[in-house]
Swiss-Prot record:
May be involved in the formation or repair of [Fe-S] clusters present in iron-sulfur proteins. Belongs to the NifU family. This is Nitrogen fixation protein NifU. One of its GO terms (biological process) is nitrogen fixation. Pfam families: Fer2_BFD (PF04324), NifU (PF01106), NifU_N (PF01592).
Length: 274
């Protein structure tokens, strides 16, 4: 059971600005009803000053989605579009005195809706790169651009964090490999001046990534698959799918990976399945 702050509960039970804004001239739609999360953000913006005079929302989702949308409207009313555009999903979460890690995607959805509304006001069309080469998660309709912004804005480094912040990979899990590849590419493009440990990444992260990459072809040959979720304090958490999920050989597969990791790192590593 997740622990919610009193402020989250307040904005859930008493949402601010949960209404349709008449004569809205900036509307942003994100998410999908079929995916279980959808948000429409409506703004009335002064055309001359670009000050947001009124904001309202309609959302379909969990309590955190309602609270995040409510908080967002409180944060942006009275500010110019330029000022509002600088608001991050972390500021939305902070305004609510925090959100559970598994619910951070709700604050990201609010930021994405604001981004879409500002583009709508300016007559611009956000690039929805949903062609086969860019759509990463079909279950939740999450594209590479969405993942890239979440990673860069929040310093994400693991598959588990991407799932929590975007919902990508939270369904059938078949896109985990695509997410890992996209994550690796995004991280590789970031400045290399920040040490891995300082960015929140475990010092053994790369060794674990390389080891799993070497073992995956053998696992896939037997109809299974493995994805890295996190590396924390010598504990490696992975997800198993396909024939590996719940099979009698699961413990042997984890022990095999554990042995390989200890050989590579020269220290004790515990491997567990999520």
């Amino acid at each position: 059971m997740w622990n919610y702050s009193e402020k989250v509960k307040d904005h859930f039970f008493n949402p601010r600005n949960a209404r349709v804004v008449d004569n809205a001239n900036a509307v942003g739609d994100v998410g999908s009803l079929s995916c279980g999360d959808a948000l429409r953000l409506m703004l009335r913006v002064d055309p001359q000053s670009e000050i947001i005079e009124e904001a309202g929302f309609q959302t379909f989702g969990c309590g955190s989605a309602i609270a995040s949308s409510s908080a967002l409207t409180e944060l942006i009313i009275g500010h110019t579009l330029a000022e509002a555009g600088q608001i991050t999903n972390q500021q939305i979460a902070d305004y609510l005195d925090g959100l559970p890690p598994e619910k951070m995607h709700c604050s990201v959805m609010g930021q994405e809706a604001l981004r879409a509304a500002i583009a709508n006001f300016r007559g611009e069309s956000l690039e929805e790169e949903h062609d086969e080469g860019k759509l990463i998660c079909k279950c939740f309709g999450v594209d590479e651009g969405h993942i890239r912004r979440a990673v860069q804005n929040n310093g994400l480094t693991t598959l588990a964090e991407v799932i929590n912040y975007t919902k990508a990979g939270g369904g059938c899990t078949s896109c985990h490999e695509k997410i890992e590849l996209a994550l690796a590419e995004i991280l590789a493009q970031q400045p290399q001046t920040t040490p891995a440990v300082a960015s929140g990444k475990d010092p053994h992260w790369q060794s674990v990534v390389d080891t799993i990459a070497e073992l995956r072809p053998h696992i896939q040959a037997d109809g299974g698959d493995m994805a890295l979720l996190s590396v924390t304090n010598h504990q490696v958490t992975v997800s198993l799918s396909g024939s590996c999920s719940g099979c009698m050989m699961t413990d042997m597969t984890l022990a095999w990976l554990q042995q390989k990791l200890m050989e590579r790192t020269g220290c004790y590593m515990e491997v567990v399945a999520a």
